[in-house]
From Swiss-Prot:
Protein name, UniProt field: Receptor-type guanylate cyclase gcy-27
Family (UniProt): Belongs to the adenylyl cyclase class-4/guanylyl cyclase family.
Glycosylation sites: 11
Compartments reported by the entry: Cell membrane
Gene: gcy-27
Gene Ontology terms for molecular function: ATP binding; GTP binding; guanylate cyclase activity; peptide receptor activity; protein kinase activity
Tissue: Expressed bilaterally in ASK, ASI and ASJ sensory neurons.
InterPro entries in the cross-refs: A/G_cyclase, Cyclic_nucleotide_synthase, Kinase-like_dom_sf, Nucleotide_cyclase, Prot_kinase_dom, Ser-Thr/Tyr_kinase_cat_dom
Comment field on protein domains: The protein kinase domain is predicted to be catalytically inactive.
UniProt key word Lyase: yes
Length: 735
């Protein structure tokens, strides 16, 4: 057994001269490899040259073939590297030094000897540099990889791990269900989120976890070390990142962590009858599963082991990601060794509904007493194919695989025995549908002979046949779906026009979450919007001041509620103007006007009006649980040339580039609270209309710009009466 961290700390690795005792043989061979080459070359050269003019005693010739400085350097270097191994080369070097002294005393021409010695040193320098290059290459390719494994990058230290318990999870779940009922389908899709009873923080990353009670120290074998290292290296668009495992510390727990995915699980969507899972969603999710699984099977990890609709997670961009892959055999080994047990209370338990979906060859260990299973099953490639058939069946039938056979709400122990003893399989009706081809493949997946189950490529071909009209990712399919609905529904009677409007609205709302309306419209029409430059546009940044104070005073739930509330009011302001919200990052809010829709120079006035309204909102805003809290914002904007375009294919985003963005950000960051700061060139555009009141702040040092003349925007002169009637608190801006 190897404790990788202890090994690595004891034998810190680096470049030349830092290997441990395991690598001394390889190092010794590499370091001394040039010596015989050197001996042969110099011997031939020396003997040929000496035969014409000189005759040297044997000891003198041997002296010429040695380089005392280089050999001593090699000796002491290897002594430093190898420690106790130095005796292997110390005595040859000592003998070489004695022979050198004897041969020097017998030599008759020291001038020639010194000349030969000089030439040998030049040759040795070249050979030595070459040997070092070979040495370092061997370190990088042979030893470096093993060293990185011994670092145990997959191990999560307890100091980096924090478990967050959501005490209001049940209440939040109830509100989520009520919101889904109250909202229309499009809104329910975009706002749907999972509710977590608890989650983990690893630094700043949120993670889902499964935690076991650790009874005794877990020894990591060489095979486990290699496997976990390879597991940590896996990266794919359809895999939820494996963050690592926390174990062998004073917490007495073993915790497996992977990336937290927010929108929902595939199981939730399949069993939710209010969610319209048509062939667009089915084909996209099925392809995502096969892509992730194929990557796993071709990787050194080679299997998933716990594949179920509950471990297929849908992220915020409607991309399916597979989680909890590759850990089942490691967990089972530790269960068998009695290193771990399930905790008394756990957020993650394996229900019968999941257990009956696992391959029979892996659940034979099930306890027939009827006790709820509390352990994982082992995994294999063929077992994963069995589970894929269960997932596809659930997506097609929108029901638990055995729910149509047993009238019970959820499967139980009796069903388990029927599966194991009587080869029971999920019920497939005789009704002819376009999905019959895929259902036949599902039956092949459930073959009791693992070697006769279909391959991933067979399943991919079945999906292509079954859903021939659904190709590409989910966004492409939604666009084509909308066009298809439009072509079909336009020929129907007026009674069907409502369905068309609903389908269009659903598609466009999903697209408008990620892109401006005009860009989404172009994509809908099959036009790829090119990146372009704009001669003039205005960018505004709004930042909430003293946000760190709120973070310290309020629990996370109230902080998120506060941000949702204030940014929702800001969004309302944006909708009243010709502008586009680019993004929100933490407490910072970014808006642009003049892109992608050019508005004939009105962009600077649109942003000026928005900034005044946003500041007015902040002055009148009160925190629900803290009436004394005064919201303060700082606002900065700047007008100038800008470049914009859609970045990304799978997950497109509309991004802005150019010095104008940086300048606007500097205007905000150098602005005092409750002020609206702009540059001189932007201020002159506002002053030219005689509609706005501005105050010259003066010269301000701006990072990257030097000394800049800045102005504060105070008010829109013709809106004085409206501001007073709204009860907005005035602020001494001109002081």
């Amino acid at each position: 057994m190897i404790d990788g961290e202890a090994y690595f700390e004891k034998n810190s690795t680096g470049k030349l001269g830092s290997w441990g005792w395991r690598d001394v043989n390889l190092q010794f061979i590499i370091c001394t490899l040039p010596v015989p080459i050197y001996f042969v070359v110099v011997a031939i050269w020396t003997i040929n040259g000496a035969s014409n003019s000189y005759r040297f005693p044997f000891l003198q010739t041997y002296m010429i073939l040695t380089d005392r400085f280089w050999l001593f350097f090699r000796c002491f270097t290897i002594v430093a590297w190898c420690g106790w191994c130095s005796n292997y080369i110390f005595f040859p070097c000592l003998m070489n030094a004695i022979l050198y002294i004897i041969s020097l005393s017998l030599s008759r021409d020291t001038t020639f000897i010194l000349f030969i010695f000089y030439q040998m040193n030049k040759l040795i320098t070249v050979i030595r540099d070459f040997s070092y290059s070979v040495y370092n290459w061997c370190y990088e390719t042979v030893i470096g990889e093993n060293t990185r494994k011994y670092k145990m990058t997959w191990k999560v230290p307890k100091e980096s791990l924090k478990i967050i318990v959501n005490k209001n999870a049940d209440a939040r779940m109830q509100r989520e269900l009520e919101n889904r009922t109250a909202k229309d389908e499009a809104n329910a899709l975009t706002s749907r989120r999972r509710v977590f009873g608890s989650y983990a923080l690893i630094g700043t990353q949120r993670a889902e976890f499964i935690q076991f009670r650790q009874i005794k120290h877990i020894d990591i074998t060489n095979a486990s070390l290699d496997f976990l290292y390879n597991l940590k290296q896996l990266k794919h668009d359809n895999l939820a990142n494996f963050y690592g495992i926390q174990l062998n510390d004073d917490l007495n727990t073993m915790t497996i962590l992977h990336a937290l995915v927010e929108r929902g699980t595939l199981e939730e969507f399949c069993l939710d009858r209010d969610f319209g899972m048509d062939e667009t969603f089915k084909s996209a999710f099925m392809r995502d599963i096969l892509k992730g699984l194929q990557y796993l099977h071709l990787s050194p990890v080679a299997y998933h082991g716990h594949l179920h609709a509950a471990t297929c997670l849908i992220d915020i961009n409607w991309v399916l990601k597979i989680a909890l892959y590759g850990v089942t055999n490691f967990v089972c080994d530790n269960f068998d060794a009695e290193n771990i047990t399930m905790p008394d209370r756990s957020d993650y338990t394996i229900s019968y509904a999941q257990y009956v979906c696992f391959p029979p060859e892996h659940i034979r260990e099930y306890d027939a007493t009827g006790k709820l299973p509390t352990r994982f099953v082992r995994g294999s490639k063929q077992g994963d194919i069995y589970c894929v058939g269960m997932i596809f069946y659930m997506m097609i039938e929108r029901e638990d695989p055995y729910r149509l056979i047993h009238s019970v709400e959820r499967p139980g122990s009796g069903l388990m025995m029927e599966i194991l003893d009587h080869n029971l399989m999920p019920f497939i009706s005789n009704n002819e549908t376009q999905e019959d081809t895929l259902l036949d493949k599902c039956k092949e997946c459930w073959n009791r002979d693992p070697e006769k189950r279909p391959t991933i490529e067979n399943l991919r071909n079945a999906i292509a046949i079954c859903y021939a009209d659904s190709k590409g990712n989910l966004i492409d399919q939604m666009i084509r779906m909308n066009e298809k609905y439009a072509d079909e529904l336009e020929t129907l009677v007026a009674a069907r026009s409502a369905d068309l409007a609903l389908a269009q609205m659903q598609t466009m709302r999903l697209l408008n979450e990620m892109l401006p309306a005009s860009i989404a419209k172009d994509l809908k029409n099959g036009v790829i919007a090119p990146a372009r430059s704009y001669a003039s546009a205005t960018v505004m940044f709004v930042q909430i001041c003293d946000f760190i104070v709120i973070l310290k005073r309020r629990p996370p739930k109230e902080v998120i509620g506060f941000l949702n509330d204030i940014f929702d009011q800001f969004d309302t302001v944006i909708k009243r103007h010709d502008a586009y919200k680019v993004e929100t990052t933490g407490e910072t809010y970014m808006v642009a006007s003049g892109v992608p829709n050019e508005n004939e120079g009105r962009h600077v006035f649109e942003v000026a009006e928005m900034s005044l309204e946003i500041r007015a909102i902040s002055l009148s805003y009160t925190l629900e649980n803290d009436k004394n809290y005064k919201l303060r914002v700082r606002i900065g904007f700047h007008a100038g040339p800008i470049a914009a375009g859609v970045i990304g294919i799978k997950n497109p985003r509309y991004c802005l580039f150019g010095d104008t963005v940086n300048f606007a950000s500097r205007m905000q960051s150098n602005c005092p609270p409750l002020q609206i700061q702009t540059s001189e060139i932007t201020a002159r555009m506002l002053l030219a209309t005689h509609e706005y009141k501005l105050v010259k702040r003066g010269i301000v040092h701006v990072k990257g710009k030097g000394e800049v003349n800045c102005y504060w925007l105070n008010e829109h002169i013709h809106k004085d009466e409206e501001i007073e009637e709204s009860g907005t608190i005035s602020h001494p801006l001109e002081s």
